[in-house]
């Protein structure tokens, strides 16, 4: 954290990301924040855990998580966190905090899961920061060795396993079922 958050207990500090594609989490290399939006360090008064998320989305996120006893202990612009490192939720590696203007405050947490092998914005953002490109899925749609214990699993089949593991380890703040559009091949009608 470059000493910027040294006054906080790092073992209880978590950046909260939101994703609809759980299977892409092994490919996470970064967490994107909007440079000029306000981000809050939110303390769960029930267990002492602290979460970093967009200040504008705090009430919504904490509501989804079912946490009503919380307080904002400090706020910073997204640029404050640039180049900090966060532990990956289930792999022995870190994710870099990066800045991106495409991060919006209309949904999610304001902290965007960034996996350069799975999205154009993710790729461009990581490239801008000189990060390696990782595609931890092979041509058959299975996780590669980079995905650790999920190696060899078909990506769609790994979703419930990753979710279960995150719940059991305490790395999951909340989950909910949502319906949204997803790109499909116009010829074969399969997900891309």
Where are these regions (language model features)?
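Generic secondary-structure transition motif, activating predominantly at the C-termini of alpha-helices
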Residues: 33, 65-66, 166-170
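Protease-associated
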Residues: 30, 37-111, 120-124
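Residue patterns forming the tRNA-binding/recognition surfaces of aminoacyl-tRNA synthetases
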Residues: 1-26, 83-85, 93-98, 102, ...
């Amino acid at each position: 954290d470059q000493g910027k958050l040294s006054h906080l207990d790092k073992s209880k500090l978590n950046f909260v990301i939101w994703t609809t594609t759980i299977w892409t989490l092994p490919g996470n290399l970064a967490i994107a924040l909007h440079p000029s939006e306000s981000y809050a360090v939110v303390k769960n008064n029930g267990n002492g855990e602290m979460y970093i998320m967009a200040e504008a989305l705090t009430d919504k996120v904490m509501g989804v998580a079912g946490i009503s006893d919380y307080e904002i202990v400090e706020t910073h612009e997204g640029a404050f966190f640039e180049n900090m490192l966060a532990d990956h939720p289930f792999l022995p590696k870190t994710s870099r905090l990066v800045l991106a203007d495409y991060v919006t405050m209309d949904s999610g947490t304001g902290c965007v899961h960034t996996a350069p092998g799975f999205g154009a914005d993710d790729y461009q953002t990581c490239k801008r920061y000189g990060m390696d490109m990782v595609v931890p899925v092979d041509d058959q749609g299975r996780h590669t060795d980079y995905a650790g214990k999920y190696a060899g699993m078909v990506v769609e089949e790994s979703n419930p396993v990753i979710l279960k593991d995150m719940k059991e380890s305490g790395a999951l703040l909340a989950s909910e079922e949502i319906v949204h559009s997803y790109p499909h091949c116009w010829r074969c009608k399969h997900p891309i």
